């Protein structure tokens, strides 16, 4: 491993060791990667959502949606997901981009997977410079970091949802049978087509 590559991986490591945050921002990873490789960097979820972006050259691929939080086209995301191992210096026409857009643009696609589960894609592109072996190593190292962060986020959301359900169940146990029945009617009414609650009707139904 060259000294330059070692320095670059250490910059990624610093994001993991940031004491000011308990989580790694995908945008920060894109920023660091993009600046080191002089490339546009995009982290895309398996559903096609742009979790993080860094644009080094906003005129490189005009038709590509690059706003963080937005979704890329379904067909494009499917093409990304069909890439099962790192592909360097990809012809953009194979992804559905026009011949004009691919002129002089080199792309690097690295799957984001943990434990055999596909979580997303890292997409890097830049003008007039092919991606090297060291660039590939750095991208694959970065996708490991991103994959672990995605898994952590999924687990965190699951824990929050489970906590909400637990609190709701605990709250129900403090109610009388009649109150529990009333709550049941309320939630049933909230799921109605008009989305409104009529308390007099509820009172009549509950008795």
Give residue spans per PLM region.
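A short beta-strand signature within small-molecule sensing/ligand-binding domains used
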Residues: 101-112
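Short hydrophobic/glycine-rich mini-motifs in sensory/regulatory modules
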Residues: 112-122
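Short secondary-structure transition/capping segments
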Residues: 86-96, 139, 195-207
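Structured interaction and signal-relay segments at domain junctions
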Residues: 2-11, 19-103
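Juxtadomain coupling helices with adjacent low-complexity linkers
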Residues: 2-17, 22-23, 29, 68-69, ...
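Signal-transducing coiled-coil/dimerization helices and immediately adjacent hinge/linker segments
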Residues: 152-207
């Amino acid at each position: 491993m060259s000294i330059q590559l070692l320095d670059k991986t250490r910059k990624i490591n610093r994001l993991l060791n940031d004491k000011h945050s308990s989580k790694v921002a995908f945008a920060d990873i894109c920023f660091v990667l993009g600046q080191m490789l002089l490339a546009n960097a995009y982290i895309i979820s398996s559903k096609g959502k742009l979790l993080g972006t860094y644009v080094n050259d906003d005129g490189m691929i005009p038709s590509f949606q690059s706003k963080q939080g937005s979704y890329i086209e379904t067909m494009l995301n499917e093409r990304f997901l069909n890439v099962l191992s790192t592909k360097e210096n990809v012809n953009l026409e194979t992804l559905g981009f026009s011949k004009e857009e691919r002129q002089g643009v080199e792309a690097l696609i690295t799957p984001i997977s943990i434990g055999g589960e596909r979580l997303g894609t890292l997409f890097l592109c830049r003008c007039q410079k092919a991606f090297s072996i060291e660039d590939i190593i750095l991208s694959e190292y970065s996708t490991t970091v991103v994959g672990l962060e995605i898994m952590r986020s999924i687990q965190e959301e699951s824990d929050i949802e489970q906590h909400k359900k637990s609190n709701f169940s605990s709250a129900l146990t403090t109610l009388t049978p009649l109150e529990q029945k009333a709550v049941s009617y309320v939630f049933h009414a909230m799921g109605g087509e008009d989305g409104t609650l009529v308390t007099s009707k509820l009172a009549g139904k509950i008795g």
